[in-house]
Amino acid sequence: MAEQVLAQYTVFWTVITPASRASADRRRAILAPYATDPELSRLLRGLAAAEAVGEGQYGAEVPRATVTSVRGDTAAVRDCQDASHAGKISLKTGKPITVGVPRNPVNATLRRGPDGRWRVSTVEFTGRTC
């Protein structure tokens, strides 16, 4: 079960950049297999706000995650992801605006849906070190 959780969590980070480049009406379809509310709605709002000011995402965070617990349909993940090849990009120039850090601590919760699929429901960037 932990393997399924980690697989979904890992793919979640790879679909954010394609979702940021997609039309607003396609974003939910790209993200929904890997994210659920409240994180899904938060992501959609954030991507729309970024697009409104000419920003998108580039790259993908590389998880170094472990599942810390699975209780019923809820799983907790602790991550020290490498975000050094990801960040915000100017949609006009194609140039990076921000660059992530190589050791980014993240706590996430995944929920298993009625279809049996695990989806990220919350993401917390702790601001600590890892």
Where are these regions (language model features)?
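Surface-exposed, charged secondary-structure patches
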Residues: 52-93
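Short beta-strand edge/turn micro-motifs at domain boundaries
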Residues: 76, 96-130
